[in-house]
Amino acid sequence: MITMQNVRKKYKDFELELSLEIPEGRITGFVGKNGAGKSTAIKLILGLVKPDAGKLCVLGNEGGELPAAVKQKIGVSLTESGFSSQFTVEDVWHILAKMYPDFQKDFFDKKCDVLKLPRKKKLKEFSTGMKAKLRVLTAISHKADLLILDEPTAGLDVEARNEILDLLREYIAQDEKRTILITSHISTDLESLCDDIYLIHDGKIILHEDTDVILEQYGILKVNEEQYRTLDKTAVIKVQKETYGYACFTNDRRFYQENYPQIAVEQGGIDELILMMTGGYR
């Protein structure tokens, strides 16, 4: 579905160099600190910027620029994109109907009712949650094979976030070949939705792992100086010096639970993954 092999994009003060593969039928999370390169990677995938080097393939199309037929198969929701604030949902409906031959008019209408999106109200009067729901709805309403979503639930309350996540689960359940690439700073959303996670830092992928593996096997060891000195560090990925001693990030917390019962072992989630992998040493 998406393949990037040594894809490079260089700017004056930043350079991106990525290799990743997102097969069909997967929901993949793309995480990292602000400025890590997520937005640049998305622009490359969408053909908004051209790579300086490397091989990029999206939906079978190789090269930076996407032909119209491929664009028809992609649904996009970006944080800084959207329709004119003077438009209404009815205006959006007519625009989508003209843009996409596969626009699902009845589906769009039904979901507007479910999501409580008024048809005649101008978008400038919409709440943040309503705008976010409309962005995602427009992305999934034309039978896209690939969804690319940049922070779709940012700044939303729990109810609005869950409505959007339910939309995405319904979308993926309708066709097992559909694929989603999603960025988010809300780790619980990713942990409940994604099959796997790519972590990007300073323009490079530094970790790729299945979400279940992260939640079931990763963890943080809290050790003092003496415990750290005698610790078997074979399964320690990163170490962070702290006031009391060390925090050690591991991809095999069960090993330490079984062999070092005196050590405090905490479960590692996506937040811990980002914090430890983009800091510490080793």
Where would I find each of the regions flagged by the language model?
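A short, flexible loop at the N-terminus of ABC-type nucleotide-binding domains that lies
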Residues: 1-19, 24-26, 67
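Walker A (P-loop) phosphate-binding loop of ABC-type ATPase nucleotide-binding domains
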Residues: 32-37
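Helix-to-loop junction immediately C-terminal to a conserved catalytic motif
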Residues: 46
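Conserved ABC transporter NBD signature motif
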Residues: 54-65, 69-70
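ABC-family P-loop ATPase nucleotide-binding domains
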Residues: 72, 78-135
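Catalytic Walker B motif of ABC-type/P-loop ATPase nucleotide-binding domains
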Residues: 147-151, 156
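ABC transporter nucleotide-binding domain
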Residues: 165-181, 185-250
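C-terminal coupling/interaction segments
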Residues: 236-282
